Curated annotation (Swiss-Prot):
Pfam families: Methyltransf_5
EC class: transferase
One annotated GO biological process: rRNA base methylation
The protein's Enzyme Commission number: 2.1.1.199
Catalytic activity entry: cytidine(1402) in 16S rRNA + S-adenosyl-L-methionine = N(4)-methylcytidine(1402) in 16S rRNA + S-adenosyl-L-homocysteine + H(+)
Role noted for this protein: Specifically methylates the N4 position of cytidine in position 1402 (C1402) of 16S rRNA.
Chief localization: cytoplasm
One MF annotation (Gene Ontology) recorded for this entry: rRNA (cytosine-N4-)-methyltransferase activity
SUPFAM superfamilies associated with the record: Putative methyltransferase TM0872, insert domain (SSF81799), S-adenosyl-L-methionine-dependent methyltransferases (SSF53335)
Protein name according to UniProt: Ribosomal RNA small subunit methyltransferase H
Keywords associated with the record: Cytoplasm, Methyltransferase, rRNA processing, S-adenosyl-L-methionine, Transferase
Gene3D superfamilies, per database record: Putative methyltransferase TM0872, insert domain (1.10.150.170), Vaccinia Virus protein VP39 (3.40.50.150)
């Protein structure tokens, strides 16, 4: 999976800042909130994947009386987001946590006695993680195989590669990477690590490149792309966190509130799609996207990696409100 972001440079008080995350589908997401909340409303937002703070910046700027709960499992990312949002510091509460661990008890411990009205999850990995973290998310540089979004918690990719049995590795590569060469790759990894541990991105990328015949390499992508994706998902338990997190957040969402989720590959999107559909069948939830909203061609031209983004939206209401309709949402579900 490519990075759903590009690098841009901002200026503040005439001083150039380091590159920051590009907010995928920022216009569409902001428009949905504008259609559901008044500009002067004291909206409480929850950004469950703060990243560089790009989306949160848009919300705080558009809704001058709003507050935001800023969450990220990575303490470095949270710090970067807070720096970007420094002009709004009095309206920001930051919590270093995974969005799958957010509940009212946690919010109360931070002095928040209300539930959020607007929730956003951007499930893409940031430019910082890919190219600047040094944690082995990309094979463009030789880096340690870490891949932990929270560098202080859990097993690293190196530990998984050098400890997991062959069948478990094969299942990870096939299930999370949809890699047809999973069995052969797992076999070679197990044989290789008997002599030397696999510890860097280059070592893993070169190993996979030698296993998959060149005629089967995916067009325009490195042959190890799927393996890196699968490892990252396993290291961070990403799919489990999405499934569990949606349950907690949909329960937490205030009546009349809206949750928006951007996914970037089919495994993520399937969970979001099915979860939203199941909740929409219950009295009290309305699916606002019968089909996902894709980035505009203008955005794709500006940021090609955003082309894989899918935005899905759900609203919490006592009864299904048929008044809200948008031409983007009228198509039948795929």
């Amino acid at each position: 999976m490519e990075s759903p972001c590009r690098t841009i440079t901002l200026e503040k008080n005439g001083t150039s800042l380091e590159p920051v995350h590009y907010s995928v589908q920022g216009k569409e997401i902001l428009q949905i909130f504008k259609e559901n909340f008044q500009k002067e409303d004291p909206v409480l937002f929850l950004d469950g994947t703060a990243g560089e703070g790009g989306h949160s910046f848009l919300f705080l700027k558009e809704f001058p009386n709003s507050r935001i709960i800023l969450c990220d499992r990575d303490p470095i990312m949270l710090s970067r987001a807070l720096t970007r949002l420094s002009d709004f510091s009095e309206r920001v509460v930051s919590i270093q946590t995974n969005f799958s661990e957010i509940n009212q008890k946690l919010l109360t411990s931070y002095g928040i006695d209300q539930t959020p009205q607007g929730i956003l999850l951007d499930l893409g990995i940031s430019t910082f993680h890919l190219f600047h973290s040094g944690r082995g998310f990309s094979f463009r540089e030789s880096e340690p195989l870490d891949m932990r979004l929270n560098p202080n918690s859990g097993q690293s990719a190196e530990e998984i590669l050098n400890i997991y049995p062959k069948d478990r590795l094969m299942n990870i590569f096939y299930t999370y990477g949809e890699e047809r060469w999973s069995k052969k790759i797992a076999e070679v990894i197990v044989e290789t690590r008997k002599q030397n541990s696999i510890s860097t991105t280059f070592e893993l990328a070169n190993l996979v490149s030698k296993i998959i015949p060149r005629k089967f390499w995916p067009p325009g992508r490195h042959p190890a792309t799927r393996i890196f994706q699968a490892l990252r998902i396993e290291v961070n338990q990403e799919l489990a966190h999405i499934e569990n997190g949606l349950k907690l957040l949909l329960d937490l969402l205030r009546l009349g509130g809206v949750i928006q989720v951007i996914s970037f590959h089919s495994l993520e999107d399937r969970i979001v799609k099915n979860s939203f559909r199941d909740y929409a069948k219950q009295n009290g939830f309305e699916l606002l996207t019968k089909k996902p909203i894709f980035p505009s061609q203008e955005e794709i031209d500006e940021n090609p990696a955003s082309r894989s983004a899918k935005l899905r939206i759900l609203r919490k209401t006592k009864s299904v409100d048929k008044k809200y309709r948008n031409k983007n949402f009228e198509e039948e579900e795929e």
